[in-house]
Amino acid sequence: MDIVTAAGGTDPEPVPVEASFDEFVTSGGADLRRALTARYGVEVGVEVTADVFAYAWEQWARVSAMANPIGYLFRVGQSAARRYRRQPVVLPIAHAPGEPDFDPRLPHLLERLSDRQRVAVVMVCIYDWTYPKTAQVLGVSESTVRTHVRRGLQTLRHGLGDAE
């Protein structure tokens, strides 16, 4: 159904706000959750993700018009995380059946990386995100992501005794 505008033209019927928000959460929500969980750990990351989606819903008219809403909401998540008690990031050690085994020192070594290095390494090497996608979500340049990944992997290799 088309809507007749005041100028006499027709516009397609607008997409309901709920539908566009649901589509956004479905398409980008997992990426945002993964980025926030990689940054803040499972417990805080999940809580912050919920806070961010609540904020996005309240501000949907403004957020939906942004060129990079995921990147913006990641920054909102950084601010929201400040409300949570400062705790060291605890990465889960258990992994799903069928996943490759990993060195049990790895979670501890990941915790020792800088926040930016850890997020970049997890997004690129564990979640298999591209450098451009990671850069977009984090709101940094692709070369910054490459640098963080390179330095993070170098630190991990050194810690595991596999220095190149």
Can you name each region flagged by the protein language model?
Residues 13-23, 33-51, 61-67, 164:
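Short, charged helix-capping/linker segments at alpha-helix termini
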Residues 58-65, 75-94:
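Arg/Lys-rich amphipathic alpha helix in sigma70-family domain 2
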Residues 100, 110-118:
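Short helix-coil-helix linker/hinge
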Residues 32, 36, 45-56, 134, ...:
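Short, small-hydrophobic-rich alpha-helical interface motif
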Residues 24, 28-32, 36, 52, ...:
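Residue-level preference for hydrophobic side chains embedded in well-ordered alpha helices
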Residues 120-124:
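A short pre-motif secondary-structure segment
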Residues 36-39, 105-113:
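Short amphipathic alpha-helical boundary/capping segments
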Residues 78, 138-164:
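DNA-recognition helix of helix-turn-helix
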